[in-house]
Amino acid sequence: MNNAHEENISSVTGFKSTSGSPAIGSSLPGRSGEGRSSSSSSGSTALLAVVNSTLKAIFSNTLDSIFHMVCTDSDKRLSSEFHCLQSMFNLQLFVNLGCPLS
């Protein structure tokens, strides 16, 4: 009876029931988890450095363009206050992100 049931399942699904066999994917290379920590940590460090520099460039350029549009040369006091705010914002942003300050 059990054998007939297994044959019925295999005819429908195309898979034969194999009791006691190892789990699917256990024999695939790279599935055991060994030797993956060193490569992933160096890769994540490099990725973090790229993300940090990219964010720094994006925020720096965006803020520069915003503050240049808002600041006017006719009002030097306003212009200097905006540049002071920009510097403080950049400093706080990169401290929060953990970016190295340059």
From Swiss-Prot:
Polar residues compositional bias, start-end: 9-21
Ranges for region Disordered: 1-43
Comp. bias intervals (Low complexity): 25-43
Other facts: Partially overlaps YDR456W.
Name listed for the protein in its UniProt record: Putative uncharacterized protein YDR455C
